[in-house]
Amino acid sequence: MAQTVPPCELPCKEYDVARNTGAYTSSGLATASFRTSKYLLEEWFQNCYARYHQAFADRDQSERQRHESQQLATETQALAQRTQQDSTRTVGERLQDTHSWKSELQREMEALAAETNLLLAQKQRLERALDATEVPFSITTDNLQCRERREHPNLVRDHVETELLKEAELIRNIQELLKRTIMQAVSQIRLNREHKETCEMDWSDKMEAYNIDETCGRHHSQSTEVQAHPYSTTFQESASTPETRAKFTQDNLCRAQRERLASANLRVLVDCILRDTSEDLRLQCDAVNLAFGRRCEELEDARYKLHHHLHKTLREITDQEHNVAALKQAIKDKEAPLHVAQTRLYLRSHRPNMELCRDAAQFRLLSEVEELNMSLTALREKLLEAEQSLRNLEDIHMSLEKDIAAMTNSLFIDRQKCMAHRTRYPTILQLAGYQ
């Protein structure tokens, strides 16, 4: 507050003025007709005295006002300088505060950009891993389709098919998991970029405010670019307070840091998912390959046994054919003695009169015929049995050959088709998205 000189009353001054009261005065010569329109001499003196006094008072008041004005100008000049210096210092402090916030925002933006790039790399790994699962899935489905072409009785739901179905289900589940994780990564990348953009806008505002305050800090009373802005002192309704301004930036930083932490956690999760899924796929691939190997060993062993039985069956067929031929020859050999005995009986039936006797020779011939018939019956039954056995052997021979052919076909499918195709299975690095 400027100090002023307090007002005070002027001292009374006496003035020595010569009065016109001599012998030749005209004070008494006034006529009655002019008396009313003229002043008295005393009035004239009083008027002069009043003018003198008024002039002195005005000069004295002017001197006091000049003194007060000079003093006020000096004080206001000093006050203006102090105020300007204080404002410059305050603007400088604000510059430091703005620079501090700007630096924190800059660091957070750089950290968020780096984190986003790392998450983008993880997303690309997920996409490569998802693409890599297409090869195992096509291999598995091709194996299942190829094994559908196995012939009876080898078209069975064996351990290999069970493992292949488990592998197909595992691949489908992993593909769904990778797709969900990719969508989660895309969403997190979008959030990272949104918060980075928010920090960039805040940083840009602070950069502009910093430049403005820096320009303000360089202004002084001798600056030529300053102008009068009478309405600049009006507060804007949208103006923030230091507390709300700091809270706004702090909230932006906290949200950005929170998303950056969530992004880092997601990257760790992606690493775990890719490691686990690639290991699970390779373990299941090894399980399928092991099942194929065991199944091929079983087929090889079964085919070897079938070949062994086929060899024995062929030998038995040969022996049985010889047996059938021998039985036929034996039957043929029994026909001549039977015909002899029957001829003898026939001829002896023509003996005359008492010579037609049932003698020992007759009974022996009858028993011979009966024995020969029984032998022929037994031989014919045995021949039928031998022929049926031969037919059975021929049937089993055909069945064995069909089974061997089916086993050979199954071995070809499992070994030459399926296992050869499975050599194209991706490596663990490809399944983990590194290649």
From Swiss-Prot:
**What kind of modification does the protein receive after translation?**
Ubiquitinated, leading to its degradation. Deubiquitinated by USP16, promoting its stability.
Q: Which GO terms describe its biological process?
A: cilium assembly; cilium movement involved in cell motility; flagellated sperm motility
**Keyword Ubl conjugation set for record:** yes
Give the compositionally biased regions (Basic and acidic residues). Answer: 60-69
Q: Where is the composition biased (Low complexity)?
A: 70-85
Coiled-coil-forming residues are 102-180, 310-336, 363-411
Of the GO CC terms on this record, one is:
sperm flagellum
Where do the segments described as Disordered lie? Answer: 60-96
Give UniProt keywords alphabetically. Cell projection, Cilium, Cilium biogenesis/degradation, Coiled coil, Cytoplasm, Cytoskeleton, Flagellum, Ubl conjugation
The places in or outside the cell where this protein is found are: Cytoplasm, Cytoskeleton, Cilium axoneme; Cytoplasm, Cytoskeleton, Flagellum axoneme
Q: How does it assemble?
A: Microtubule inner protein component of sperm flagellar doublet microtubules.
Q: What's the protein name?
A: Tektin-4
Q: Which organism is it from?
A: Homo sapiens (Human)
